[in-house]
Amino acid sequence: MDLQDKRKPIPFISSFSFAVSGIMTALKTERNMRIHFISSVIVLVLSFYFSITKMEWLFILFVIGGMFALELINTAIERVVDLVTVEYHPLAKQAKDLAAGAVLVYAALAVAIGIVIFLPYALHMF
C-alpha cells in the first residue's frame, strides 16, 4: 500500500486564501463572530485612547486572537455536526454545547481581563 500522497502540495498563498475565506464566511454568517469583531474594535480603540502598556497590549492581543480562533473552531464543529446528521442526536447536541461552552468560558476570561486592564484607566478619569 502506497502511503505517499499523490496530490500536488497546495501553494502557501492558496492556503492563506482558504483561511481568509473561512474568516470572511464566519463574519458574514455568524452573529457571534460579528459581535466579537465589533467588541474587538471597541477594545482596540480604548487601548489606543488609554495608551495602555506593552504588557497590557500583549494580553489584549492574545485575548482578541484567542477569541476569534475559538469562535472559528466552534463554528467549524457546528458545521461538521450539521454535515454528519440532520436528525436530532444527543451526542450532536453535546458536541455543539461543549464547543459553545468553551467559547463562553473564554469570553468570560476576556471580559475579566478587560476589566482588570481598563477599570483603573476609567476610574482615573473621574
Model-derived features: where do they sit?
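Amphipathic, hydrophobic secondary-structure cores in small proteins
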Residues: 79-91
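Hydrophobic alpha-helical transmembrane segments
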Residues: 2-73, 88-90, 102-126
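Divalent-cation-assisted or electrostatically stabilized phosphate/pyrophosphate-binding catalytic cores
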Residues: 94-97, 103
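Active-site His/Glu-centered metal-binding helix of metallohydrolases
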Residues: 73-80, 98
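Residue-level signal for inorganic ion chemistry
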Residues: 23, 78, 95
